[in-house]
Amino acid sequence: MSSKTSIDLFKMARFTNLVIPVLTVVFFLGGYFLSFYLHFFTVFFLFLTIINFFYRHVQKTHALLRNFGIMGQARYMMESIGPELRQYFFASDTEERPFNREERSEVYRKAKGIDSASSFGSQKMFDATEIKIRHSMYPTAKDKLKPYSVTFGEERGIENKHMFTRPIAISAMSYGALGQNAVRSLARGAKAAGISMNTGEGGYPKYHLMEGCDLIFQLGTAKFGVRHEDGTLDDEKLRKVASEDAIKMIEIKLSQGAKPGKGGLLPKEKITDEISELRGVPKGADVISPTNHVECEDPTTTVQFIKRIQDVSQLPVGIKLCVGCLDEFRSLVVEMKALDIFPDYISVDGAEGGTGAAPKAFMDNYGMPLFPALHGVVTILKEEGVRDRLKVMAAGKLIGPGRQMVAYCLGADAIYSARGFMLTLGCIQALQCGNNTCPVGITTHDPDLQGGIVVADKAKRVENYVENMEHDFYQLLAATGKNSVQELSTSNLYIPSGTTLAEFIQPDAAFNKAG
């Protein structure tokens, strides 16, 4: 039945390919004999004829265009606007990835200072795939809650400790991945909100430093800004960076959630003269960082490298990693115990974390999701008796208060978010981060597109987002009946059997045990 009633597109294309040159001739004759103005149509159809001839007989790349001609181009045009059509007209509020419309809207509202209360009921799925937070029959009174604070470096007793006084920090985003207006907006907003910002692995943080916020300098595998020509660490360059008043901590990036086992990638389209100078890399080619630090060949050399950075910088030093194998992580912890050398914090990056550019094969298939990875890391630290020797941070799609509170229940001391703050700047999830064509000017170095970011306005939105996230944090904490995040545990979570976390938790521990 369908074969008889369906449209034969190939026949339509053949008919179209015949009609276009015929109409060209018809309008030419009409313009010659009837009215000169018909030659406007002659020019139009002659142009179509030439384009059609090129598609069908000259170009050899696209088989569809060789068979269907100009009519086949309609398919490519529809495909190119498909993401926009789905996002704005067809996808429901809870369908899109990595963040659906409901999740993005909550961030937008918090950034604009608009009440994010909803009506009628949740759009979440209350089934075996949703982790929920268990409330108490006896919520904690507001005046009984302990103000949030976490101090990095206190375990080692160093002089240059660093304290977070708000339950969120801006995760690693470099100048290069972001444009200068976006970096300055985030840094100015971080300063106003009193939170720290990670510089990312982009070398000397010129634009991060302009706004005076507390910074965490990230040392990537390429060591941009602090390297010798052979890619090894230049201690003097690192010492100079660490001496900047705004640099409060150093973070050694071992791996990243969106591309674990793969070095960072900055597409050549985004490498300006300035970025080339700041990173010490040539223009005209993609900048691909090594897969690992050349100094880190095994657990022993990795721990020794951590100690080296601590000695050179005289600052709190953490490591960032995406967990692949928990046994491998345990071997690293065992070596820390043996050498009595510990980082001041470990940042656990979930496989669902974001990036400006990464191979899709890595983005889709490698790394442990945040929650099981975080639980595994904290459990190993406890089993090895060293949980009190360092802090644990968590990152990976933590843009809303619910997932952040789950991370705290799983043992995190502090939370990182990157894409949450990008959304505060107006990110529309166009998925153009690596193409230098970001339509709102966040992840581009095109001066015209960057003009969309007004630093003063966006900095205020960053501040609003932090204020409203903190408000929700204390409300959710109070509902658990606890006084501080240090009292939270997995017993404060309902973890259904269908979640990736369930197999790592003891049976019934999250359901029957009193919170």
Question: Model-predicted segments: where are they?
Answer:
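Conserved, well-structured core domains of diverse proteins
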Residues: S2-I168, A172-S196, G202-G212, F217-E229, ...
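Internal alpha/beta core interface subdomains
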Residues: Q180, R184, A193, M197, ...
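A glycine-rich phosphate-binding loop feature that marks nucleotide/adenosyl-phosphate handling sites
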Residues: K206-H208, C322-E328, K391-P401, K482-G498
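Glycine-rich tight-turn/loop motif centered on a GG-T
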Residues: F217, T221-G225, K268-E297, G356-F371, ...
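Phosphate/diphosphate-binding loops
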Residues: R227-K253, P369, T379, L390, ...
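Carboxylate/His-rich catalytic cores and anion/metal-binding grooves
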Residues: E244-P267, L326, S331-D344, V348
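Glycine-rich phosphate/ribose-binding loops and adjacent secondary-structure elements
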Residues: I288-Q450
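Active-site or pore-adjacent capping/gating segments
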Residues: I428-T490, P496
